[in-house]
Amino acid sequence: MSFEKLGEDGKARRGRLTFPRGVVETPAFMPVGTYGTVKGMLPRDIEEIGAHIILGNTFHLMLRPGTEVVKAHGDLHDFTQWQGPILTDSGGFQVFSLGEMRKITEQGVTFRSPVDGSKVELSPEIAIQVQRDLGSDIVMIFDECTPYPATEKQAKESMELSLRWAERSKRAHEGNPAALFGIVQGGMYESLRDQSLEGLEKIGFDGYAIGGLSVGEPKEDMIRILDHLPPKMPEDKPRYLMGVGRPEDIVEAVRRGVDMFDCVMPTRNARNGYLFTSAGIVKIRNAKNRHDTGPLDERCDCYTCKHFSKSYLHHLDKCGEMLGSQLNTIHNLRFYQNLMSGLRGAIEAGTLSDFVSEFYALRGETVPPLGDS
């Protein structure tokens, strides 16, 4: 993988990731295909909505179907028939989500499989090997996602453990041509974030991710870390904000210099009839949509908006028809890709401020201030 920075507007960056399997323009949003599928989407649908990279999950794919099944097809690309680049999360966040069901030691984590209750071990070496077996194009180190809230002492111990695991991840990755990304931890403490970043840079990675955000903290804390951290991250490497996915949060992170994003929000919300539009959220199951013959979003060029009315989408939702979830997902993911395309174009043209102003004005909101970092 190579990363080329093509332009800037303020702190925002316009870039390009080049892989043997394809090119990804940044800022980029990666649809999440946890089990090897972006729910409700065929691979050709993902291409048509404009995504060029997707995310898979090491934790879930390791448990089901297992790497031996995937490897029998070749790799995850062959198994899923998605031939573009794939980033795989190492499983650290999913282990964090298990709460009291898991035990963390210096070696790694042991837990009971949510699939069949069997005892499972996950360590830096295992996580990296699983991602090698999957044929990931971007491999994530195995880390501990610092919980919120955490005292400074707890956050420091967690961050230092993640740094030790980062070294082991780097060693385990040797000989794999795929990119390897480090993950900055440290909770809500700027000084710990700095220590984590410094330690990761000494080890050396192909890209750097910001982990441990969108884990329950107030939005002002997330913005405070985003004001502080991205400007300190390597200029010549991609910056990836993990699991943060509200459109406004993506806009604010891009303004602060972040390049890559993923979140289940557009797909999960689509299945629940919670749709993103240029004017804000549309809850399609609300009664007011029953007789609305207009499109979901007049500014959207997706298949759903070009062919179907809000009334029809409301009808599908009320009937529990699977087509409703599919059409909603196509729209939400296309909305996100259009947002990223708009951000890229604005950075190129030096008009990001105007783009951001219009983004908030259409929602009836004012532009939040940028920090001074």
UniProtKB/Swiss-Prot annotation:
Binds 1 zinc ion per subunit. InterPro entries: ArchSynthase1/Queuine_TRR (IPR050076), TGT (IPR004803), TGT-like_sf (IPR036511), tRNA_ribo_trans-like (IPR002616). GO terms for molecular function: metal ion binding; tRNA-guanosine(34) queuine transglycosylase activity. Signal peptide: none annotated. Keywords: Glycosyltransferase, Metal-binding, Queuosine biosynthesis, Transferase, tRNA processing, Zinc. Pfam families: TGT. It comes from the Bacteria. GO terms for cellular component: cytosol. Pathway: tRNA modification; tRNA-queuosine biosynthesis. Zn(2+) binds at residues 300, 302, 305, 331. Its cofactor is Zn(2+). The active site is at residues 89, 262. It catalyses: 7-aminomethyl-7-carbaguanine + guanosine(34) in tRNA = 7-aminomethyl-7-carbaguanosine(34) in tRNA + guanine. One of its GO terms (biological process) is tRNA-guanine transglycosylation. Its EC number is 2.4.2.29. Substrate binds at residues 89-93, 143, 185, 212. Homodimer. Within each dimer, one monomer is responsible for RNA recognition and catalysis, while the other monomer binds to the replacement base PreQ1. Catalyzes the base-exchange of a guanine (G) residue with the queuine precursor 7-aminomethyl-7-deazaguanine (PreQ1) at position 34 (anticodon wobble position) in tRNAs with GU(N) anticodons (tRNA-Asp, -Asn, -His and -Tyr). Catalysis occurs through a double-displacement mechanism. The nucleophile active site attacks the C1' of nucleotide 34 to detach the guanine base from the RNA, forming a covalent enzyme-RNA intermediate. The proton acceptor active site deprotonates the incoming PreQ1, allowing a nucleophilic attack on the C1' of the ribose to form the product. Belongs to the queuine tRNA-ribosyltransferase family. This is Queuine tRNA-ribosyltransferase. It comes from Marinobacter nauticus (strain ATCC 700491 / DSM 11845 / VT8).
